[in-house]
UniProtKB/Swiss-Prot annotation:
GO annotations of cellular component type: cytoplasm
Provenance organism: Alkaliphilus metalliredigens (strain QYMF)
Cell membrane keyword on record: no
Keywords: Cytoplasm, Hydrolase, Metal-binding, Nucleotide-binding
Lineage, uppermost ranks: Bacteria, Bacillati, Bacillota, Clostridia, Peptostreptococcales
Protein name as annotated: 5'-nucleotidase SurE
Domain of life: Bacteria
Coiled coil ranges: none
């Protein structure tokens, strides 16, 4: 198995190091990741300046690794269509993200968008996230991804599926199990912090916190709240089928 690993926290983030190192027990690992943090860039791609890819020494390992001056989606595109054109990966794994990607977070997430890009290019993919920067907790999450890949014998059959994994940030002994979930609702109380530059012009920092909302008991948000590992199969087809027939029945004219 050939595993392409990426993230949105940057190639020298602890999460990707732990993940890539653990995945060596499952197959051949190649890392292609942004040269700096690109969190919450969504599915953006670089069109107005050149992309550059450079080989890097990946921490204390001998893993083949490259940094890219672009987004997570850029990393997947250039890896699959240029670098690995003649040695196609079996699967793409994105993470371990420092922060959860639950519910509507997936629309903002560079971590998830990298996995979505892989699915667009007909490769199965996994995105893995957790709200921690503790090495021991990353290790448990990485071990779980290795088990998931080992148990998914025919991963190629999931080429149009993104498996979005969220791992709870609690002691390993407190994790109750694993749940297959749907995307929940994740909204934020946004706060815009206004400041002035030296010329007196206003600029803003956006911040905020997740709102406590009622959740479907089958949702990823609820699973994490209940101390379960959440696995959500997602897809890049955003068609809202509930409204499809209603719109078709409208008397629309050009």
């Amino acid at each position: 198995m050939r595993i392409l690993v990426t993230n949105d926290d940057g190639i020298f983030a602890e999460g990707i190091y732990v993940l890539a190192k653990s995945l060596q027990d499952v197959g051949e690992v190649i890392v292609v990741a942004p040269n700096t943090e690109r969190s919450a860039v969504g599915h953006g791609i670089t069109m107005h300046h050149p992309l550059r890819m450079a080989g890097v020494r990946f921490f204390d390992t001998s893993i083949e690794a490259y940094s890219v001056n672009g987004t997570p989606a850029d990393c997947i595109k250039i890896a699959i269509e240029v670098l690995l054109k003649d040695r196609k990966p079996t699967v793409v794994v994105s993470g371990i993200n420092n922060g959860p990607n639950l519910g509507t977070d997936v629309l903002y997430s560079g971590t998830v968008s990298a996995a979505v890009e892989a699915a667009i290019l007909d490769l199965p993919s996994i995105a893995v996230s957790m709200a921690t920067s503790k090495i021991d907790q990353y290790n448990h999450a990485a071990e779980f991804i290795c088990k998931l890949l080992s148990n998914t014998l025919h991963i190629e059959e999931l080429s149009d599926t993104i498996i979005n994994v969220n791992y709870p940030t609690i002691a390993y002994s407190e994790i109750k199990g694993v749940k297959v979930t749907n995307l929940g609702i994740r909204k934020y109380e946004n706060a815009f912090i206004e400041r002035l530059d030296p010329r007196g012009n206003a600029y803003y920092w956006i911040s905020g916190k997740a709102m406590e909302l009622a959740q479907d008991h089958e949702s990823d948000v609820q699973a994490i709240n209940d101390n379960y590992i959440s696995i959500t199969p997602i897809h890049f087809d955003l068609t809202h089928f509930k409204s499809f027939k209603k719109l078709k029945n409208l008397n629309l004219e050009k």
